[in-house]
């Protein structure tokens, strides 16, 4: 993502605090002074989770399968994902009527379009996406930080990305230097979770990938767990040491 920035690092920064393991080789290659400190989300999301209490707090069923839907954090994302997600929800509920589908949004104003029309048939929860991810069996997630959160929580997921033609053209041709868009796949450099992009983002395709992911749930969760471990640094105070090193100069 925006690879060209690395050429400016030495002139702009005394030291880079790296959050992801794959950044190390890149920074070494260009002679950048850095310390790998791990990702703060890996630690903050690593505590024990009381599923029963959390489900009760969220008003969710204790025994039903839970599918989480995270359509994005921006209105433009939600608009592009609105119809395919709506089509997926209708099909999944028809085939699996006992499943509880939870739509996690940042704020009430994000509830729009066809998803709003479905709000009577699904559970809509605001400003609690991490909690929803913590208790779900699988998530359908718009690409972004939420894919990392779901990965750290070892939750199987299907990642979707749909934007307008110009945005996708610029992203694909000028900024993105990896074949993956989901952070768990980027971190592992293999396709652990399904990614659907642009014309692939349709209800039928999402449904198909969700079914396949649920069948392979255990294997996916184990691979995601290993990614979380790679984001946890062995020294709990490594971040503090890196900061002290900078200010001691």
Walk through the language-model features, giving the residues of each.
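Nucleotide-activated sugar donor-binding and catalytic core shared by glycosyltransferases
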Residues: 1-249
